[in-house]
Amino acid sequence: MGKFALNLNAELTGVKNLAPKDEESFYYAFKVQCSGCREIHDNAIEISRSETHSIPGSKGEANLIWTCKNCRKTCSFVIEGPFSPYNDSQETKKVLVLECRGCELVEFIPQGEWIANGAESNTLFDEIVLEDDWYDYDENASSEVSITNLEWSISKA
């Protein structure tokens, strides 16, 4: 069993409170390494806190149950606590914690829509895609806003 933290470091210009658009149904995508055969799998897994599954041979539940295609080891993933909105421009911050049994998280793949608020105007930006740098204009604050230099990392929690 291991707990892993998803960490973010990004340059925020004119925005704050970066988070998934609908955290309850948001799918987080990760590349994983099986702790049985040590294979890093090419296809990403997707985990959502809105899904729960019974863990085979256990009374517990997980957000995802996954079986390694190489060694058939069963892995479970649980999202612990809410996503912590990112506000700390250019500082690495833990934004999410997951408990993983049978696998390790090795890479986060940003996908889906994210939201942020204007730092000065509180304008809601609700269609942010983080696959690359993001730029927009905050009409209420009359200034450009951006999210750049995104660096996602995974560490032991």
Curated annotation (Swiss-Prot):
Pfam family, one: CXXC_Zn-b_euk
InterPro entries: CXXC_Zn-binding_euk (IPR008584)
One GO term describing the cellular component: nucleus
Gene Ontology MF term list: zinc ion binding
Key words, A-Z: Metal-binding, Zinc
Residues reported in the UniProt entry to bind Zn(2+): 34, 37, 68, 71
Disruption phenotype: No obvious growth defects. No increased sensitivity to oxidative stress caused by exposure to hydrogen peroxide (in vitro).
Similarity comment: Belongs to the UPF0587 family.
UniProt domain comment: Requires a bound zinc ion for normal folding and solubility.
UniProt name for this protein: UPF0587 protein C2D10.03c
Native organism: Schizosaccharomyces pombe (strain 972 / ATCC 24843)
Gene from which the chain derives: Ess1
